[in-house]
Amino acid sequence: VSFLHGATMKKDPLFKGAAGNKYNLRDRKPAFEVKQVDGGLLIGARRNAENDHYYWRVTPFVAPCFTVIPPRGDHPIHGHFWIPIDDHNCMAWSYDYHPVRALSSAEREAMERGEGIHVPYVPGTFRPLQNKDNDYLMDREAQRRGDTYSGIEGFAMQDASVQESMGPIVDRTKENL
């Protein structure tokens, strides 16, 4: 979480209130370290904490297409699968679970509303309501007010807008999907 997600982290019910958030909000320029391991990568974000200490958040990427986002306090653990569907597109599946308890009705309702890492969809489809064709419903007034850095609501679509704007970058012509 950097400058891009800071405002969202303060209000999203699946993130707000966790003690570690203070480090994310105070140190907006983490130092990233990536370590290649058997089966994927470990992506560490190091932030300054108190008294010459650091706050680390480590996100595993399990090849070829799976992430686990570190939990915040008692919030659910969540992550994504990116599944190729053709040479230029993939389907992103997001999940949440808690290792020691059932998800609360408030957590499930927040996910259904598209909060946390989830998104609302175009009715009857798996296409996000906010998408490249409608500029992710970017709200310049919300951006001016500081409600979001980018004017795009939600963690998932803030990330997707950056990822998708790059276009297809991997030559998949030799794969068999």
Descriptions of predicted regions:
Residues 1-177:
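C-terminal catalytic domain of Rieske-type non-heme iron oxygenases
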